[in-house]
Design a protein with these regions (language model features):
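Glycine-rich segments within core transmembrane alpha-helices of 12-TM secondary carriers
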Residues: 151-175, 198, 362-373
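Extracytoplasmic gate region of multi-pass secondary transporters
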Residues: 33, 234-277, 370-374
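C-terminal transmembrane helical hairpin of 12-TM major facilitator-type secondary transporters
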Residues: 294-341
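C-terminal ends and interior cores of transmembrane alpha-helices
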Residues: 45, 92-111, 302-317
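Cytoplasmic membrane-interface "Motif A"-like loop-to-helix N-cap segments
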Residues: 80-92, 290-301
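Helix-to-loop junctions at the C-terminal end of transmembrane segments
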Residues: 69-83, 281-293
């Protein structure tokens, strides 16, 4: 059974709701990375600026530890009660926690309680983000035409980047309009306060949604699981052990602390790189629809391993044009990998446990690889004294992920999102006609 064709009006509503909510979610989550240097000074004071920065980036990574738990709780909610309630809750949690970060007193005011409260709120952000990616991707793709799922999947990757991009624009505005002293004293709080009205908008948009045709079909068949997590052992979760994480929020820190650019110039270049990434995402999605998910994600992973070191060499040159070339090369292959990753997470799991399984699989990889990314990158750059050092981590992750995917990943193009079977007519040129259900 194919996903029912939606009307043009409903398609616009579905895409708009998923995109808007995802932008708001990642805007809130990314602000921390853009203000990591300032937050490090205020909440982790030290005689060494590097030590303060590393402490702030460590807290950035702490949020990723909570993402698997958020995936479990919000994924279970989405599989039991519907995709919409979980998506609405994720926006609420992110908005409240981000707003509260804006209100936190610094270490100079309340001492050690300040970093402890910051860690707690970052954990809530991580919990929320743990359910957002898989939930939004599932909601979008369960509404998408089967032959356009790759293109629709690119909306999630692109809007994630747009959310980060908008956070960068706001950070740029604060840098341009305020002095460094004003940013440190109170200006950094203003972007975080934007989370409150944005959360209200996100809640309104998502509350008005209907649930997906796939979940409605499960309800009609009385196949909605009461305990979806119990069946995950058969769902193929172990086949997604590693993922890719775009170090967008680290780039601006790298450009200012390692390369030596001014903050305004670093933010402009980072914003440009994110814009390029978001523009490439639809092309990556169409590639997956045309040639298959497996070859596209393998090309992305292998490409990242190849271009990471040259890209960081260009980034480390300090020349804006060369930096932009390096970011563009990195963004192109990152888009191929990330767009297909979201699509595969939906198509690999059965409808009854789709959000739980994909959220846990994705977030375990993020907690192990993505969360420590900025901290590892900054530590390598500081320890080795090389601007190219963060690329070593990217190469290692990309190679390991590509090898694992090449070994275990089936082709999923043409998968029916209810039955889990794949039409032989949709098979790619490899001739692999294995159904997804058989690979579980």
């Amino acid at each position: 059974m194919s996903t029912p064709r939606t009307t043009a009006a409903r398609s616009r509503q579905v895409v708009g709701a998923a995109a808007a909510g995802n932008v708001l979610e990642w805007f809130d989550f990314a602000l921390y990375g853009f203000f990591a240097v300032t937050i490090g000074q205020l909440f982790f004071p030290s005689t060494s600026p590097t030590a303060s920065l590393l402490a702030a980036l460590a807290v950035f990574g702490v949020a990723f530890i909570m993402r698997p738990l958020g995936g479990v709780v919000l994924g279970r909610l989405a599989d039991r009660t519907g995709r919409r309630p979980a998506l609405t809750l994720s926006v609420l949690l992110m908005g409240v926690s981000t707003t509260l970060i804006a209100c936190l007193p610094s270490h100079a005011t309340i001492g050690v309680a300040a970093p402890l409260l910051l860690v707690a709120l970052r954990c809530v952000q991580g919990f929320s983000a743990g359910g957002e990616y898989a939930g939004a991707t599932t909601y979008l793709l369960e509404n998408a035409p089967s032959h356009r799922r790759g293109l629709w999947s690119s909306i999630i990757s692109a809007t994630s980047a747009i959310g980060v991009l908008l956070a960068g624009v706001v950070a740029l505005g604060a840098t341009a309009w305020l002095t460094e002293e004003q940013v440190t004293a109170w200006g950094w709080r203003l972007p975080f306060l934007l989370a409150a009205p944005l959360a209200v908008v996100g809640l309104y948009i998502r509350y008005r949604l209907d649930d997906t045709p796939v979940f409605q079909e499960l309800e009609a068949r009385d196949e909605v699981p009461q305990e979806p997590l119990r069946s995950l052992g058969r769902s193929g979760i172990g086949r997604i052990g590693l993922g890719f994480y775009y170090l967008a929020t680290y780039v601006v820190t790298h450009l200012t602390t390692v390369v030596g650019l001014g903050r305004t110039e670093a933010l402009l270049l980072t914003i440009a790189g994110l814009a390029i990434y978001s523009l490439v995402c639809p092309l990556a999605g169409m590639s997956g629809d045309r040639w298959g998910r497996r070859p596209t994600i393998l090309l992305g992973g292998l490409g990242l391993a190849v271009v990471a070191i040259p890209s960081f060499l260009l980034i480390g040159s300090g020349t804006p044009a060369l930096i932009l070339i390096g970011l563009t090369a990195f963004a192109m292959f990152e888009a191929l990998a990330n767009v297909m990753l979201g699509l595969l997470l939906v198509e690999l799991f059965p409808a009854r446990t789709r959000v739980s399984g994909s959220a846990i699989g994705f977030n375990l990889a993020q907690a192990a690889v993505g969360g420590p990314g900025p901290l590892v990158a900054a530590t390598l750059a500081a320890g080795l004294g090389l601007a190219v050092a963060p690329a070593f981590y990217v190469v290692a992750v990309a190679l390991l992920a590509t090898i694992a995917l090449a070994r275990y990943l089936p082709e999923t193009r043409g998968t029916d999102l209810i039955t889990g079977t794949r039409s032989p007519a949709a098979a790619p040129a490899t001739g692999d006609l294995t159904t997804v259900e058989e690979t579980r």
